[in-house]
Regions:
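Class I S-adenosyl-L-methionine
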Residues: 1-142
Length: 142
């Protein structure tokens, strides 16, 4: 545990907050999409064409579902294997997220952190939410 804290640059308070959040997420049970996503604390897990990059696929009549997770060790977990080389220039701080950070809201980062932690704390619920969202988008695309 001490290695995890030092590796992620966390103090005792931050580490305890992370543990509490991970416990909360780990104990979430599937109750249907709407109830579960509300309990997780985000509006959605992923979406089709939610960014300028993903909207380009619509020009080719392809719906691309994407999930934005927290970059490098922002969530306490690293989901980017190359972050050591690029975290200083990461696109995580660009676009709408840059505006959100400048306005001091932090809601985009907070949402990405929750999604990333859910992935590690409760993979079953994460996958059920993701599959549910993809199925909804697939039906709409047909």
């Amino acid at each position: 545990m001490a290695d995890f804290k030092s590796k992620n640059g966390m103090n005792e308070v931050e580490y305890n907050e992370l543990q509490n959040e991970m416990d909360r997420l780990a104990n979430i049970k599937w109750q249907g999409y709407a109830k579960t996503i509300k309990e997780v604390g985000v509006s959605y897990l992923g979406a089709v064409a939610q960014s300028a990059k993903l909207r380009h696929s619509l020009y080719h009549k392809v719906s691309t579902y994407g999930i934005y997770l927290a970059s490098a060790n922002l969530s306490g977990f690293n989901v980017c294997p190359n972050s050591e080389y690029c975290k200083d220039n990461c696109l995580n701080g660009s676009g709408h997220n840059r505006l959100d950070r400048l306005s001091k809201k932090g809601s985009i980062d907070r949402s990405r952190i929750i999604k990333t932690r859910l992935f590690f704390a409760n993979r079953e619920v994460f996958m059920r939410i993701m599959i549910n969202e993809i199925e909804k988008k697939r039906k709409k695309a047909e």
